[in-house]
From Swiss-Prot:
This is Octanoyltransferase. Keywords: Acyltransferase, Cytoplasm, Transferase. GO terms for biological process: protein modification process. It catalyses: octanoyl-[ACP] + L-lysyl-[protein] = N(6)-octanoyl-L-lysyl-[protein] + holo-[ACP] + H(+). Residues 59-235 form the BPL/LPL catalytic domain. Its main location: cytoplasm. The record marks 165 as: Lowers pKa of active site Cys. NCBIfam families: lipB (TIGR00214). Coiled coil: none annotated. The lineage of its organism: Bacteria, Bacillati, Cyanobacteriota, Cyanophyceae, Synechococcales.
Amino acid sequence: MNKQFHSCSPDPDDGEKLDIDYLSDEGPSTLIFEPSELIDFRVAWDWQKQRQKLLFEKPGSSQAVWLLEHSECYTLGRGATEDNLLFNLSNSPWDVYRIDRGGEVTHHMPGQLVVYLVLDLRRYKTDLNWYLRQLELVLLDTLKDLGIVGKRIDGITGVWINDFKVASIGVGCRRWITQHGLSINVDCDLRGFERIIPCGLTGSKVGKLSSLIPDLKTVDVKPFIKKSLTERFGL
């Protein structure tokens, strides 16, 4: 299959129509969206850029969090090397996006829960390292609530179960307003990771939660993610 490589702009195009449903300011200080269908990566990123733009222009606006699943794609961080792609970009199995987050290449697919957060860190702590560690704690809280012992590894962002990495984190931030977030492998097909060096970690093994809890689905994990986000970010 010959899929496209996309190098995407960090801002919506001038004159781009904003998605009104995802820009509503009515309700709580943080809006949480849980679309039930698979979301194309470009659509989800547009939602984040629109919300970030709104927070730039109206700093008191509501923050936003999305819990969703993507159709298959790969994403590369802003400084990621294409050497971690084990295929030719001209013959990619799925679409590939270079985006404005940190980190190397990762893979998204159905059965993986992705959480995007557009938060104003000035409401919390203007420290990106603190923010990354909070996202790791959200993942560890979630695993604990599921009866699973997870761990962090010093110097490497993410969460592991034994020797298997089950969750990745990659964020972008402009003027202390965040984009992107985290992903956790629940009941997904992991074979797409064989085409990349995940997160640039040579020899790293990738796992999923359903290997430990058969029949676990993303819908089962969402309540625990939301619980921890509420506790740690006051959503």
